[in-house]
Swiss-Prot record:
GO terms for molecular function: rRNA (cytosine-N4-)-methyltransferase activity. Its main location: cytoplasm. The gene is rsmH. Residues 1-21, 281-315 are annotated as: Disordered. Keywords: Cytoplasm, Methyltransferase, rRNA processing, S-adenosyl-L-methionine, Transferase. GO terms for biological process: rRNA base methylation. S-adenosyl-L-methionine binds at residues 51-53, 69, 96, 117, 124. Specifically methylates the N4 position of cytidine in position 1402 (C1402) of 16S rRNA. This is Ribosomal RNA small subunit methyltransferase H. InterPro entries: RsmH (IPR002903), SAM-dep_MeTrfase_MraW_recog (IPR023397), SAM-dependent_MTases_sf (IPR029063).
């Protein structure tokens, strides 16, 4: 078996997230323009989070929103933020992959628009207790719904070196995945893998520190593990598969993605001219002013399409 030399490294954590990235919804005005909410319209915010996008939709008098999130803490924050909206907002604790079941339980056959802001929120990244980020020490958890499922550490311990390497390559597009996986498994086997910073140290041992001004070397590995722990791509595909059935003709689907794996899935799903009419030829990205105030917006891409045809288009 190939063994990677493990050199003790006492690395400081990366700098804290800039203040401008705290709990800010991205592409808010662009989402509003795409959805074009109408009075008495019903919309789904499939990733409610802190309620930023929903608050924007509610600027339209009479518009109603069904907000879905699997993070109970996020739902509590959104409830407090949107309290003045009263019964114009319905809160659902659950996964958006089960959106048809959620809507059926509410007696809502179809909606006028659906928004999904895919991936981890800045609110989750900024909470060390969630274990999503390498910027601060926290447990190796990474679950969006902390009430169920296995943690990132449990996943690492369950997988073989080869399985972990394949996961990191597939979901993190990390070309040095085998070296990274070996270092991670060595740390786990020796009891040196407990926290997020332990994981970052293991990755740095495998690939070396970041270049000045470069992307942190642990970024791809953390992304891969988070996607796997939460089944993010499977969740997205299930949502997109259901979208034509739950969005009424003339309604709009708007999806914000943050990396190429997500964007490719969305782009492929919208390539059905009998079902979707794209609202823009290319994805919408954030302007310089938004990126300056919220650096997370730099990688955001919004794809939006209008639902065309009726039930016959789905046959």
């Amino acid at each position: 078996m190939n063994v990677v030399n493990v050199v003790p490294m006492h690395l400081p954590p990366p700098p804290p997230r800039p203040r401008g990235e705290q709990h800010v919804s991205v592409l808010g005005r662009e989402v509003l323009a795409a959805l074009s909410p109408v009075s008495e319209g019903v919309y789904v915010d499939a990733t409610l989070g802190a309620g930023g996008h929903t608050a924007t939709i509610l600027e339209t008098p009479g518009a109603r929103v069904i907000g879905i999130d699997r993070d109970e803490r996020a739902l509590a924050i959104a409830r407090a933020r949107l309290a003045r909206a009263g019964d114009r907002v319905t809160y659902v604790h659950g996964e958006f992959s089960e959106i048809e079941r959620h809507l059926a339980a509410l007696g809502v056959p179809q909606v006028d628009g659906l928004l999904a802001d895919i991936g981890v929120s800045s609110m989750q990244l900024d909470d060390p207790g969630r274990g999503m980020s390498f910027r601060a020490e926290g447990p190796l958890d990474m679950r969006m719904d902390s009430s169920r499922g296995e943690t990132a550490l449990e996943l690492i311990e369950r997988l073989s070196d080869e399985e972990l390497a394949d996961l990191i390559y597939r979901y993190g597009e990390e070309r040095r995945s085998r070296r990274v996986a070996r270092c991670i498994k060595q740390a786990a086997d020796s009891g040196e893998l407990v926290t997020t910073l332990d994981l970052r140290r293991a990755v740095v041992r495998a690939v070396g520190p970041a270049r000045i001004g470069g992307v942190d070397p642990a970024t791809r590995t953390f992304q891969a593990l988070r996607i796997a722990v939460n089944g993010e791509l499977d969740q997205l595909e299930a949502l997109l598969e259901a979208a034509p059935r739950i969005i009424a003709p003339g309604g709009v689907l708007a999806v914000i993605s943050f990396h190429s794996l997500e964007d490719r899935i969305v782009k492929r799903a919208l390539r059905e001219p009998e079902v979707w009419e794209p609202l823009t030829k290319k994805p919408v990205t954030a302007g310089d002013d938004e990126v300056e105030g919220n650096p997370r917006a730099r990688s955001a891409k919004l794809r939006a399409a209008r639902r065309v045809g009726g039930a016959e288009a789905l046959a």
